Amino acid sequence: MNLRKTAALLLSLIMCFSLILPVGSFAEGTVTAADNAKRSENLLAFAGRLHNMTEKYSAEYTKKAADTDPYANGRIIVKSAEELDYTGSVAHVNGYNDWHIIQYRTSEEARKAAEAFELVKGVQYAEPDIVMQADQEPGVNEFLSWGYGADYVDAFNYNEWMLDYAGGVENLPEVVVAVIDTGYDSDHPYLVGRSVPGYDFVNNDSNPEDDHGHGSHCAGTILDGNLPNVKIMPLKVLDAEGYGNSAEIILAMEYASLNGAAAANLSLSGPCDNDHNAYVEVVAEGMAHNDIVYCVAAGNNYGSDASTRCPANVPDCVTVAAHDRNKRMADFSNVGEIVDITAPG
């Protein structure tokens, strides 16, 4: 495990338990709040243009094919500071971070275009805009998490010690965790008052309400074991069926970094092997400039190798698999050398 990933893993564990004292920075560059605010504004403008394009063409691919074909939606992400030739495409958006999101009629056209762009001078990478899905164990829809109990993490006693040490919750710093998922049920009694403003990248608005349930479940799991100083930043990237696209997810990951999240949770995945350069880029930049830690699911494909899933296979992410009540690997969880840690699931 490289030094940066080791630091990220240690920091993620610390953030899970709401550390009292500030964590020492391992950032590589200085970025001001004004820099982040301007970049965030440009990001949302780009997200709006992307939304208009994806909404128009989203019905032209079959979501059922998404878990086997990275090019299922006929769309690619190209990184280049140069102008590109969009011949053969039906739509495109650009103008942020040198990203060009290009739409084609079929998955095969998109695949061939990506291969061709890889040969173009000045292109850093060309890869599919992968369709992603929520990672969930069927039938699990509760907020009280057994993994925080006395036989496991023992969060209650830890939090009692934390409160005693700090002299009250009012002395703890606010810790923001971005949940990049299906949204947030702001009316749920367990979640009321435990969030900061987020964004809906699916509908392109500032109201990330959950119309699926998975995101609220993940948020509830995080809040279960933490004191009230921990708040959720809900970033909706998956629709009512639990599907989304890499382009919006990458933008949400950067948005979390730019807007003060200490950590981000992504319980979602898609097929990608090594087509993950955009994820690698945004994770590295977020860690270097804003000290954010990205915790990602290994995936729930019943023992598959997590290295074939995005963003689980991004080296600088903390990749989390699941174990059961007997502290054995959960049968639904993905496995492999890319996994950094397991958690109750």
Language model features with spans:
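Active-site core segment of subtilase-fold serine proteases
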Residues: 139-233, 244, 248-252, 258-263, ...
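Primarily auto-inhibitory N-terminal propeptides
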Residues: 26-140
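Catalytic-core environment of secreted peptidases
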Residues: 189-191, 210, 235, 322-345
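Structural recognition of the beta-strand scaffold that forms the well-ordered cores
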Residues: 77, 125-127, 176-179, 220, ...
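Glycine-centered tight turns that cap/initiate beta-strands
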Residues: 119-122, 190, 291, 316-319
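Sec-dependent N-terminal signal peptides
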Residues: 4-16
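Substrate-binding/access-modulating region of protease and related hydrolase catalytic domains
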Residues: 213, 225, 235-316, 326-331, ...
